[in-house]
Structure formats: structure tokens, C-alpha cells
């Protein structure tokens, strides 16, 4: 088992995992196989951009050359505030382990590495908007509920 940051060589596996994750999590969404090419193009562009800037970090668990789990972290740089040093925070999303690798503690091991990495880089905190099914997982890994954010849905 290898826990590491993803790179451009991982793009095809990451695209497939994102596709599978969406199909699994939203079975009623009526996504067609014919949608894959357009999705692939958009996701590939996103990943190439993510690997070429310092705003996204994609962590993976790899076993025998196959990525079996991933977590995406977007770095959010805050506006400086007088009287204190301003540190960034992380937004965690796209947390996914393939079905046949679940229940092995891989997600928790990945989360442990990410938390150590974020502490070393002086991140102030990491936020995640969990689904109902994932709340226990995040709780086991040190996350607590905070006040609900507000949103303005624009589209």
C-alpha cells in the first residue's frame, strides 16, 4: 500500500473513479454512458489544472499500481487580518474508496496522512460537507460538526 499525492500519470484512474463515485452516489441522476466523453474532457482539464497550480492536492491510496481511494483538498487562502499570521485552510471533497476496498481502514489511513500534512503546512483547519452516510467516518477521524454554512444557490 502506498499513500501519496497524485500526479498526471494518475489522470485516467482519477477520472474513472470520479465517474464511478457519481454513478454510485446518485443512481437516479440518469447519467448515460454517452455522457462519459464530455465528462472525461472536462475532468481531464480540471485535473491538469489542479496538478499545475498550488490550490488542489489530490491524495491517493495505491495498491499494486491501482488507485483504490482518493481525497481532494482545495487550499483556501484567507484575506490577511491585522494582529495575527494568516494561515490557509483546506476544503476536503471527493472522498471515495472503491467498493471492493472498503472496510479495510484505507480511508482512515489516508485521512491520517492528510491531517499530518496539513499540520506540517500550518493549515488552520480542514472543512468537509459530509453526506449523511459519511458522518460516522469523519467523526472517527477527528472531525466535529460546526455551525451550518449559509448558501445562495445561483443555478
Model-derived features: positions:
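Conserved acetyl-CoA pyrophosphate-binding loop and the N-cap/start of the following alpha-helix
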Residues: 101, 105-113
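Conserved GNAT acetyl-CoA-binding A-motif
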Residues: 111, 118-130
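Conserved GNAT-fold acetyl-CoA-binding loop/helix
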Residues: 22-46
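Conserved acetyl-CoA-binding loop of GNAT-fold acetyltransferases
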Residues: 5, 123, 139-149
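A short helix-loop-beta-strand connector motif used in the catalytic cores of GNAT acetyltransferases and
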Residues: 44-59
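Conserved beta-strand-loop-alpha-helix junction that forms the acyl-donor binding cleft
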Residues: 126-136, 151-154
